């Protein structure tokens, strides 16, 4: 699972190159949201399911971006249909990124269907609302306890305080859903 089906940064490079390498010995699927699709994936037999969404920052409809960036039932249903074709005993769902176009709603599916789930963390969004343990406004490392009152009232986000509040809501949803997964490794 990765936001993009192409390399647009370090995390996507790891996700796509891992999928290409694993495809030499295993049946590999890449579930993603943002096109284009890296043609190397299909050349080595990776089955790509790319739903063709825009990432949150580039969706012109800001209301849709704000709401679908927190929880996306449409994408969740597509992911659920994919997992219904796989065996929870024989499959591992490997998450790379889900904060630019996908959402934690996918973890609700892995929990419900009892899939083993692996997460490669490329940032700190599982632990810090702004993803960096960093106060971007003061240009210094942040030592606040994530999601504490001190954290939530601090304007530390790289973009804006409303963005920080939105990210905090997203993190609360994410942590709630991830806690339901009994097989996250």
What residue ranges belong to the model's regions?
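Short N-terminal targeting/anchoring amphipathic segment
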Residues: 82-102, 116-120
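N-terminal strand-loop element at the rim of the active site
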Residues: 25-73, 82
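N-terminal subdomain of nucleotide-sugar transferases
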Residues: 1-39, 44-47, 87-89, 113-116
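Short aromatic-enriched loop/helix-cap "lid" or pocket-rim segments at secondary-structure transitions
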Residues: 12-13, 40-45, 59-63, 105-107, ...
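Conserved donor sugar-nucleotide recognition element shared by glycan-biosynthetic enzymes
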Residues: 11, 72-75
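Membrane-proximal helix-turn-helix segments that form the acceptor-binding/catalytic region
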Residues: 112, 140-185
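Active-site proximal beta-strand in glycosyltransferases
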Residues: 92-94, 110-157
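Conserved beta-strand->loop/alpha-helix structural units within folded catalytic cores of enzymes
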Residues: 1, 9, 96-98, 104
């Amino acid at each position: 699972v990765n936001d993009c089906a192409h390399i647009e940064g370090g995390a996507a490079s790891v996700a796509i190159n891992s999928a290409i390498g694993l495809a030499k010995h295993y049946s590999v699927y890449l579930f993603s949201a943002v096109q284009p699709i890296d043609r190397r994936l299909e050349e080595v037999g990776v089955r790509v399911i790319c739903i063709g969404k825009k990432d949150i920052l580039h969706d012109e409809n800001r209301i849709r971006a704000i709401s679908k960036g927190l929880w996306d039932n449409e994408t969740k249903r597509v992911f659920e249909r994919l997992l219904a074709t796989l065996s929870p005993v024989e499959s591992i769902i490997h998450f790379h990124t889900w904060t630019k176009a996908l959402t934690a709603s996918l973890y609700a599916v892995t929990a419900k269907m009892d899939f083993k789930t692996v997460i490669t963390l490329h940032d700190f969004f599982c632990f810090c609302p702004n993803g960096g343990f960093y106060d971007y406004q003061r240009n210094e490392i942040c030592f606040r306890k994530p999601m504490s009152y001190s954290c939530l009232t601090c304007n530390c986000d790289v973009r804006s305080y409303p963005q920080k509040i939105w990210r905090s809501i997203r993190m609360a949803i994410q942590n709630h859903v991830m806690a339901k997964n009994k097989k996250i490794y």
